[in-house]
Amino acid sequence: MAVKTYKPYTPSRRFMSNLSSSDITGKASVKSLLIKLPVSAGRNNNGRITSRHKEGGAKKFYRIIDFKRNKFNIQGKVAAIEYDPYRNCRIALIHYVDGEKRYIIQPSGLKVGDVVFSASSGLDIKTGFAMKLKSMPIGTIVHNIEMHPGAGGALARSAGTSAQIMGREGKYIILRMPSGEMRYILEECMATIGVVGNEDFANISIGKAGRNRHRGIRPQTRGSAMNPVDHPHGGGEGKTGSSGHPVSPWGTPAKGFKTRKKKASDKLIISRKKK
């Protein structure tokens, strides 16, 4: 998919780029698979800001995606490739032979007219097919991976991402995650074969503030531009550097400080992600 640039007829357009929509074939979304999500805009039930730099953004409908891929042994055909405003990859509309329609994340290379299947075992290693990890050979590239059997895919779902099966050990499969982390996943978990499409998403440049406002992202004020009451970096006469190490507004170190809580699932991580 090509990255589209624009003529610099305004300064904001000079470095702006976007993805070509030539791969989108769907004319209209399936209404039964659309819902309207409430917009919190970073506020809690008291109306107070709990997550900064968020707003409503452009109006959009959420597409109900089949992350579980649990329609076993029924053939489906790709009817359309569509844009999804809630994610950075494309989605594929699947028409099953029994009449049901579902959306799935579009793997790279999946096009209109292709056939997809889901089964617990016994399928060919083909892009878009979904099965349990225990049925896939070592070296298979997968995405939309479950962390708990039957819970639906949670790992490797964004544009251009994938994981690779590196080995087996007892009831676990060893996966190399997109970050480089090596971890165990139960062999009963489902996954979809292939790499998530829209790989060029990482190459686009937002270019102007208005596009981020449409995405629901508000401007971020530097701590050094605030008063001491508002931020540890605030205050001083004129432009002054902060004393000590950079911290968040609440005093947590901002550079390299680990904030991840310990979990029981830490034992399933073989090696941490690459530095």
UniProtKB/Swiss-Prot annotation:
Family matches, as Pfam families: Ribosomal_L2, Ribosomal_L2_C
Record's GO cellular component terms: large ribosomal subunit
Disordered, as annotated region: 210-275
Keyword entries, A-Z: Ribonucleoprotein, Ribosomal protein, RNA-binding, rRNA-binding
Domain of life (superkingdom): Bacteria
Signal peptide start and end residues: none
Biased composition (Basic residues): 257-275
GO MF, any single term: structural constituent of ribosome
Stored PROSITE patterns: RIBOSOMAL_L2 (PS00467)
A GO BP annotation: cytoplasmic translation
InterPro entries with a match to the protein in the record: NA-bd_OB-fold (IPR012340), Rib_uL2_dom2 (IPR014722), Ribosomal_uL2 (IPR002171), Ribosomal_uL2_bac/org-type (IPR005880), Ribosomal_uL2_C (IPR022669), Ribosomal_uL2_CS (IPR022671), Ribosomal_uL2_dom3 (IPR014726), Ribosomal_uL2_RNA-bd_dom (IPR022666)
Family to which this protein belongs: Belongs to the universal ribosomal protein uL2 family.
Assembly and oligomerization: Part of the 50S ribosomal subunit. Forms a bridge to the 30S subunit in the 70S ribosome.
Name under which the protein is recorded: Large ribosomal subunit protein uL2
Source lineage: Bacteria, Pseudomonadati, Campylobacterota, Epsilonproteobacteria, Campylobacterales
